[in-house]
């Protein structure tokens, strides 16, 4: 059976460019399914799924969208419709990849549809916006974004090279052999930051030596969301959540938040989770000159040229502790909270720049007061989070939960 590639985009404004990509893909022996998400103009390339069908699936009609003249509403309808169709095609047809190109509108619609596909299916997005902040488009999925350099307006010497590269990149991904994500060993999701790396690596090695495969997610916002998504997809069977720092950014206003649903998936799916307040001593910002004026006089630490850390206060830790405690109370089964009494990160240790006994005490007390002990086991240890004893204790607890 031929591998099928979805080509999705606004065929009224970018028909020539999509045909260029389509011809390359089909020349390499792959089948294409073209989806039109344009609204106003006539498609310049015949689609397999036209814009009328996309609009209907999205809850409206093309006629209604044109009549309303509301670009935002039209975008929302076409995003919903295209995502639903892409998801259905993946389930029914066994889609092998997806590619698109566009400006702000096309990128928003196509990337939304791409995020409906599971991790591992190749996704390539050629965009005029790919050199800026791509977080709204990539989200927690493995979307490859390629900067178009020039506006996507016809085929010329430069655009033909860029579009060819994009098409052949997708072809290579689709034709290449990759191992299946689901392996024989049970998958465990773990969260890590630079300041919790030592502890996480110790726990990871212990888990792997005991027959588990560990996927480590960098707790940068996108990492936390990616782990939550894979938990809900059913891939991950247990969670070693040693680094819950994304809640600092969510509560205080840093740049690496994972959104308000972090720490929900494991409870909702009913899988074992062992959690620690890793790196809850810090809020993340970009280069030091980008730190908001209101925080300029706080305890700041230049982690590197592009990352500035800000020490959390007692008041912030109380608020963070309440939120995390409430999230853990969603647990249906097998949940433990490990508290490292000698610090939650490498720089929250005695003599280090973020060491704060009172701040940590406020955090720990709030967690203990908020957590429902009938649902969540609390384990306090006289260690720093990176100590071997602490890390192995967390790993052992998770194994016990998963094997009982």
Curated annotation (Swiss-Prot):
NCBIfam families hit by this protein: PRK02399.1-2 (NF002674)
Domain of life: Bacteria
Pfam families, A to Z: UPF0261, UPF0261_C
Transmembrane segments: none
Name of the protein: UPF0261 protein CTC_01794
Species for this entry: Clostridium tetani (strain Massachusetts / E88)
Matches recorded under InterPro entries: Tobamovirus_resist_UPF0261, UPF0261, UPF0261_C, UPF0261_N
Sequence similarity: Belongs to the UPF0261 family.
């Amino acid at each position: 059976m031929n591998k099928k590639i979805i080509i999705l985009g606004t065929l009224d404004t970018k028909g020539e460019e999509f045909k260029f990509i389509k011809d390359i893909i089909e020349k390499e022996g792959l089948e294409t399914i073209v989806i039109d998400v344009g609204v106003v103009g006539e498609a310049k390339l015949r689609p397999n799924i036209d814009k009328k069908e996309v609009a209907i699936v999205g809850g409206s009609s093309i006629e209604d969208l044109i009549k309303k003249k509301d670009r935002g509403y039209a975008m929302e309808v076409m995003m919903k419709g295209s995502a639903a169709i892409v998801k259905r095609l993946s389930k029914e047809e066994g889609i092998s990849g997806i590619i698109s190109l566009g400006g702000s509108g096309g990128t928003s619609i196509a990337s939304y549809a791409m995020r409906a596909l599971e991790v591992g299916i190749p996704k390539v997005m050629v965009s005029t916006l790919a050199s800026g902040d791509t977080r709204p488009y990539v989200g927690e999925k493995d979307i490859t974004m390629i900067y178009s350099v020039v506006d996507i307006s016809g085929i010329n010497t430069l655009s033909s090279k860029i579009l060819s590269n994009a098409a052949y990149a997708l072809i290579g991904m689709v034709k290449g052999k990759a191992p299946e994500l689901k392996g024989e060993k049970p998958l465990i999701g773990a969260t890590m930051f630079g300041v919790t790396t030592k502890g996480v690596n110790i726990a990871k090695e212990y888990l792997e030596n005991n027959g588990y495969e560990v996927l480590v997610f960098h707790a940068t916002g996108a990492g936390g969301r990616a782990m939550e998504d894979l938990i809900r997809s059913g891939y991950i069977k247990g969670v070693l959540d040693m680094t819950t720092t994304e809640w600092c950014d969510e509560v205080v206003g840093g740049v690496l938040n994972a959104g308000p649903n972090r720490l929900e998936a494991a409870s909702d799916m009913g899988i074992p989770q062992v959690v620690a307040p890793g790196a809850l001593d810090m809020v993340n910002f970009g280069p030091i000159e980008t730190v908001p004026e209101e925080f300029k006089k706080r305890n700041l630490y230049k982690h590197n040229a592009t990352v500035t850390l800000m020490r959390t206060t007692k008041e912030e830790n109380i608020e963070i502790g309440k939120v995390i405690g409430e999230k853990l109370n969603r647990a249906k089964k097998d949940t433990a909270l490990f508290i490292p009494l000698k610090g939650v990160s490498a720089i929250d240790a005695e003599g280090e720049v973020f060491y704060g006994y009172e701040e940590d005490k406020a955090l720990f007390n709030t967690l203990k007061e908020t957590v429902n002990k009938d649902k969540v086991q609390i384990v306090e240890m006289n260690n720093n989070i990176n100590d071997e004893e602490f890390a192995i204790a967390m790993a052992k607890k998770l194994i016990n939960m998963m094997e009982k």
